[in-house]
Structure formats: structure tokens, C-alpha cells
């Protein structure tokens, strides 16, 4: 007997019992994006490997350890996208969307990283990202954060996420800080773990993000990034903070927040939660004003963020159980008796025409009334429309409210109007 083929570790199937809540959450997110005037862009899952090496940075964990890279039949090195920003910038340059233009874009889809699978973090995971091009003031940074705050309110999780902010300054300011940080770390090398020693010269700002308690204690005496900011970055950050305060959005300045990708400058932010066990990031982003030019385009200011949907779904389910999936079926059409099926299917099509927003399922495979009503319950239907031989003969149908048990005989021409009243 052939061995069953199973899904790859860390790449999950999402079954109908799970996708319904995903659809409702994604619908909520997309509605808010539409209310801000953002447009969807759809991007390839596979890109040329040099795109990510140039955008993310060759000495980052993502590029060094986590990318799914392979050679195609033409000998080209290709990579399954580990994040969405690089591909979005590439598309913007390629199609002439960016130079001297303003773009407000969003995308959604699977990303791939070869990490150790754990709760809320998988090798194939789903992200929703937002990218804005052509605007350099702190007001657009603030709008993106306000947009995310509106998401949390719509999903009922506002009390379970907190905002952390930082400014990592200009490239020049960061280079000066990097030198000071490396000098400090060299003086205390014996207190660093092996991972921090490796990062000390390749990506020293990532040491600030270490989860090692001993390293974190050491960093209390390290030079502060805020002391090395250029004046323009200070003004930008102060403007952002003022806008958030005016909007009533609470935040904490975290001077060790640097983000794991090399393309960021100035504003960086994360929404974090403690409601899934250990602290986890729900949504994160920042400015990347140099990335478009770095990838071959003309200098264009840019800011954006990305959010992992697996972790967001877990959070909504954990803290807001009242946020339930929409029912799969609103109306279940029950038909029993000789020659009733064709009449039932014709009525179902007419009702779909007259009630386009309603989800209606027709019973197939026969069965007595008891079995068919059991199927209606299984699918979560609120109402059953019943056709038997007598109803077909006299042009009526029975409409039954499956919650109250009340039922009414209605002329078939009036069924849609009756259902509209019943379903509200």
C-alpha cells in the first residue's frame, strides 16, 4: 500500500472549519483599507534571489538562514518571497508607479521562511502588508498607525495590543551609532552569547533585539541610539508622536526597537501583545526612504508595515470569542417527494437572483425531512425553505425559522420578500 503524502512541516492546510473566521477577519481588514483609499496590488510568490539580498541585506537572518532558494531550469536563482515589501517596490519601479507619484497600496498572501515552526509562526505564513510611496512627512506614518488602530477596534482586540515606537535616524546617523555600539560591545565581549558575537560586526543593531536576559542587562549601559539622531529625524519623530497623541493613540518609545531588515530608516514601530503567552509582535513596519533607489529606481520616500495573519487570527480567537465566523449558509432549501428536486433547484436560482447577498444551499442526495433538517442545522442555516409535492402542485413553499420554530406557507413569488423580512 502506497504511503500517504502529507503536508510539508510548517506548511499547513486550513480546513473549512478554520477558513470561515479567516474570511471574516480579512473582510474586516479590507473594509478598513478601502475606507482609507488604499488599492490592492497582486505580486508574484517567486522573485529573483538578488532582489531580497539587495533589499533585506545579505547578513540578515532572513537571507542567511531562512530563505527558500532554488535554481530553475534556466540556471537562474529564484526565491520564494520571505516578505512583501521588496516585491512591491520592484513592481512599482518596473511599472513606473513610483517616481513623482503618490501610491497607497496593500497586498495579501503567503510568504515563506525556513524557521522552526511554532504557534503562530510557520514556514508558509500569510501576511497583509501596506506600502505608501511618495510622501515623506510624519503625517503619513501616523495615518498608517491610525489605520492599524482602527483594525484593532473593529476586531475587538484594542485592549490586548500596545504600540512601541522608535526612530533609527538617517543612514549616516545610524552609521555613527553603529561605530559607538561596536566599540561598547568589544569592551564587553565576554558577556555576549555566540549569536551576539556573530552579529557584533555583521549587524550590530540586531544585538539590541537580543532575547538573552544577560545581554539585555548589559545593554542598559550601552550608548543610546536616540543620542545619535540627526536633527531632521528628531523633528520627524517629534511630529509623529504629536500626531498620535492628538489622535488619542497611546505608545511607548522603545530605543532598542530596530527591526530585523536593513532597509528601514527613521520611524520604526511594532504592535505587540502579551495575550498569546510570551510577548509577540502582531504588526510591524516603518520608513524605508532609500529602498527604491537601492533597487534601481529614483529616490522615493516610502513607509509601510506588514502583519502576520496566523498570529492575528489566534489573538482574535483568544481575546474576543464573540467575533465569530459568518455562517456558511443562511437558507437551506429542503425538498422531498417525487419530482420536487427540479422545482426546488429552480426556486433556489430565483431566490439567488432576488437575494444576491444571501447564502443559500440546496439539499442534494435525497433523504427524509428529518435528515434534511439535520443537514440544515449542521450548516448553521437560520431559515429553511421547504418544498413537498403539495407545495409544488399549488405554487407555495413553507418558510421555517429554525431558531424559533415558527413556519409560514408563502406563495413562491413572495418567498424572497418574506425571507428578506425574516433575515433582516
Swiss-Prot record:
It is found in: Cytoplasm. The keyword Amino-acid biosynthesis does not apply. Its EC number is 6.1.1.21. It catalyses: tRNA(His) + L-histidine + ATP = L-histidyl-tRNA(His) + AMP + diphosphate + H(+). GO terms for biological process: histidyl-tRNA aminoacylation. One of its GO terms (cellular component) is cytoplasm. Belongs to the class-II aminoacyl-tRNA synthetase family. Homodimer. This is Histidine--tRNA ligase.
Amino acid at each position: 500500500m502506497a504511503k500517504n503524502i502529507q503536508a510539508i512541516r510548517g506548511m499547513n492546510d486550513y480546513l473549512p472549519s478554520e477558513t470561515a473566521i479567516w474570511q471574516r477577519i480579512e473582510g474586516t481588514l479590507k473594509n478598513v483599507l478601502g475606507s482609507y483609499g488604499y488599492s490592492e496590488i497582486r505580486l508574484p510568490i517567486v522573485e529573483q534571489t538578488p532582489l531580497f539580498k539587495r533589499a533585506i541585506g545579505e547578513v540578515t537572518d532572513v537571507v542567511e538562514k531562512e530563505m527558500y532558494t532554488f535554481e530553475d531550469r534556466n540556471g537562474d536563482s529564484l526565491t520564494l518571497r520571505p516578505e512583501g515589501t521588496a516585491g512591491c517596490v520592484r513592481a512599482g519601479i518596473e511599472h513606473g508607479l513610483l517616481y513623482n507619484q503618490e501610491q497607497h497600496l496593500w497586498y495579501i498572501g503567503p510568504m515563506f521562511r525556513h524557521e522552526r515552526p511554532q504557534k503562530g509562526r510557520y514556514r508558509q505564513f500569510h501576511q497583509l502588508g501596506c506600502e505608501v510611496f511618495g510622501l515623506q512627512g510624519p503625517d503619513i506614518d501616523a495615518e498608517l498607525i491610525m489605520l492599524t488602530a482602527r483594525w484593532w477596534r473593529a476586531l475587538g482586540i484594542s485592549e490586548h495590543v500596545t504600540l512601541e515606537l522608535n526612530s533609527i535616524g538617517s543612514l549616516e546617523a545610524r552609521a555613527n551609532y553603529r561605530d559607538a555600539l561596536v566599540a561598547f560591545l568589544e569592551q564587553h565581549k565576554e558577556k555576549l552569547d555566540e549569536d551576539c558575537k556573530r552579529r557584533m560586526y555583521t549587524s550590530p543593531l540586531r544585538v539590541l533585539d537580543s532575547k538573552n536576559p544577560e545581554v539585555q542587562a548589559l545593554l542598559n549601559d550601552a550608548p543610546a541610539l536616540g543620542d545619535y539622531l540627526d536633527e531632521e529625524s528628531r523633528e520627524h519623530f517629534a511630529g509623529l508622536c504629536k500626531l498620535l497623541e492628538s489622535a488619542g493613540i497611546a505608545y511607548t518609545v522603545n530605543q532598542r526597537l530596530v527591526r530585523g531588515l536593513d532597509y528601514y530608516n527613521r520611524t520604526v514601530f511594532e504592535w505587540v501583545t502579551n495575550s498569546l503567552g510570551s510577548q509577540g509582535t502582531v504588526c510591524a513596519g516603518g520608513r524605508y526612504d532609500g529602498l527604491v533607489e537601492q533597487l534601481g529606481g529614483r529616490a522615493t520616500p516610502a513607509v509601510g508595515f506588514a502583519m502576520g495573519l496566523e498570529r492575528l487570527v489566534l489573538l482574535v480567537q483568544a481575546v474576543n470569542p464573540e467575533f465569530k465566523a459568518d455562517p456558511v449558509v443562511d437558507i437551506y432549501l429542503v425538498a422531498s417527494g417525487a419530482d420536487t428536486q427540479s422545482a426546488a433547484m429552480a426556486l433556489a436560482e430565483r431566490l439567488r437572483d432576488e437575494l444576491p447577498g444571501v447564502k443559500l444551499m440546496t439539499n442534494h442526495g435525497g433523504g427524509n425531512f428529518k435528515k434534511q433538517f439535520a443537514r440544515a442545522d449542521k450548516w448553521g442555516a437560520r431559515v429553511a425553505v421547504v418544498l413537498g409535492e403539495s407545495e409544488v402542485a399549488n405554487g407555495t413553499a413553507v418558510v421555517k425559522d429554525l431558531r424559533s420554530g415558527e413556519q409560514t406557507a408563502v406563495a413562491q413569488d413572495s418567498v424572497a420578500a418574506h425571507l428578506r423580512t425574516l433575515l433582516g
